[in-house]
Amino acid sequence: MSTELTQAKGSTSRYTSRKSCAIEFNTKIDEVQYISVGLDTSTIKVFIDNNTQIPYVGNFINGNVISWVSDPVKCILTTSSGTYTLFSYGLTKNIPNLLDYDSDSATDDSTRFKKAILAGTESLYIPPREIYKDVMIGELDITSTLRLWGDSGSNINTGGSTIKKIASASYGIHFNGTGQTTRPMGGGLFNLQVRGESSTDTGPLIKVTSWSYMRINNCAIQNISDWGIIARDMMESSCEYTLFRRIGSDTTGILLMDDYIGTPNSNVNNFHFSNNTLGYSSGNWIKSSTNSNPDLIWIERNKFEWDGTPTSANITPKAVIDFGQMSRCRITNNGFTHFTTDHNNYEGILRMRSGCAYLTKLIDNDALSCSGYFGSVEGGKLQASGNFYNRGVVASGNMQFNVTSTRPQSIEPVICFTSNGNITSVGDYIDPNFISAHNMFGTSNNMFQTDTMASLYTTMNVPSLVEIRRFQLGKQYLDSNTVLTIQARVKCVDTAGTNGELKLNIDGTTDIGSSTITASTGWQLITFQLKPSQIGAGSLRFINSGTVSILFDGIYIQRSKYIDWNFAFNPGAIAAGASITSALQSYTDTIGVTGLIQSFSQPKFDGNINGLLCSVVSNNINGSFYVTLYNPTASPITPTITRCYIRLFLI
């Protein structure tokens, strides 16, 4: 036995909920959502099989019911006007349905949403196109918390609950909290297809403005020659497990973090874009505008794949991700595939423009069959590590980084290899004992500039008479038994002959000395040697103590295996068969501690000893010594020396 109810179009007062449906038919309906509303014909008929308690809803011409056969999915209904297939609604959540609210147009369902909002609805079910049709909307402003649910999902098929932007509309859906007394929180899109009416349509599909806790989950956003999503003043939000495809143009793309509203803090903040699939699109797939100031952006575990060029192709070269501004961002564990200049004019993966600031992390990302740059850093600070590039079908080239930003960087070269596992590039070798200026700290923000011979793309340009950088020695060097050799890699900016000068200060109190940086000779190493008594608390401060600017690339720090010592020695004439001995060179002067001096080198001098025999005589176990000159001839010899140089080898 079954029951039939016929209702005039647009009249839904008798059965807009599960409860009223049960009252109408005097039967229990627990596991299905009852949905009924006037559609595009004069009536809608709703049937409930009393044996299964499953309601079926259909859109058909009036007629007397003759018979039907039903199952949990569909009902084959025979009437005097024909045979029709009706579908069951299997939604188990008791939430309002879009079709509970009637429309004033056969081609635009926007009114239904507006009525739902006015009714205070916070969750709204969107029926699948197989039962209703594509839900058509245009310039729909949602001004309060509203969650739109469907039974579609993230896939390239076009079935299930589908919201389609009307071609002539300037945008599709706008979650718009502008001017609200209470900022909307929550809401979003779940298990839905959101599409343009055709691939050539313009106008963004989704806009979010002045909203918090927005969620887009398990959706498919497709088919528009404009932005898929534009976000402004959107906070604590996420987009996950969603497909983006056939989106964008030369001037648009998939996701735009647009200009902030009012103040820089009214921006896109704490936004998670993760586990999404992106393909077949144009423009910048993720972009921030030059006045967006986004902060705490998480782009993680996404697949970016060029697998075809959509209707609106790129005209100018593009980066997949392009930041006009960015404060803090983490781009991790993503895959990029087949982005080349031949594939829709893609020149690289990440571009950070001059408006970027603070830190972007680019960690553990893979690029397959791409070309161009892995990162172009024109502004801000990039921390990059663990990134791999597989050349794949690209004939040649290795993806690395281009850096012109004046801020310090922390970039590890990309490891590049071919599909057979052959490594083709690991970037420039950096000595493990070398510490780049990028990784040193200080009180002055001396700007960086590009230099083809800099160790990490850019080097610090330091004006005269200012502190350059600082470095704190590790505790292993503060044991009172360590001798350190510190070398600074520097270059004099002046090319007209004025030398530069570099000073090393320890702990802000002790100057080790100043050394000359010779002008017009390129990069050079300035060496300082620290005895245990000079190391102190280990705070190294490098200062440009000269009158011209210098370039500072970084420092080498090594535990010394020797110490170079020199002292005044002017022996004068030495008689035949006689010898002369220098002043005692005490270990307290040379190194300052006991037990470190093991042996001595042969001395050398600043002049000629003219046949004299030279020897080093150890004075005690601690390493004090003399230098002796002996005349083995039958005539006096006068050496032309004033200074002696000797290397003391350490344990």
From Swiss-Prot:
Region (Lectin-like): 561-651
Species, as recorded: Klebsiella phage K64-1 (Bacteriophage K64-1)
Any one GO biological process: adhesion receptor-mediated virion attachment to host cell
Residue intervals passing through the bilayer: none
UniProt KW keywords: Degradation of host capsule during virus entry, Degradation of host cell envelope components during virus entry, Host-virus interaction, Viral attachment to host adhesion receptor, Viral attachment to host cell, Viral tail protein, Virion, Virus entry into host cell
GO cellular component, as recorded: virus tail
Places the protein is found: Virion
Main location (coarse class): virion
Domain of life: Viruses
Family the entry assigns: In the C-terminal section; belongs to the K21-specific depolymerase family.
Protein name per Swiss-Prot or TrEMBL: Depolymerase, capsule K21-specific
Domain text: Consists in a catalytic region, a carbohydrate binding region and a lectin-like region. The active site consists of catalytic dyads Asp-Glu located at the interface between 2 adjacent subunits. The lectin-like region is probably involved in trimerization.
Annotated region described as Catalytic, given as residue ranges: 100-428
Role description: Functions as a receptor binding protein (RBP) and probably mediates the attachment to the host capsular exopolysaccharides. Displays a depolymerase activity that specifically degrades the K21-type polysaccharides of Klebsiella pneumoniae capsule.
Entry keyword NADP: no
Positions of the catalytic residues: 236, 295, 305, 307
Signal peptide: none
Region (Carbohydrate binding), start-end ranges: 447-560
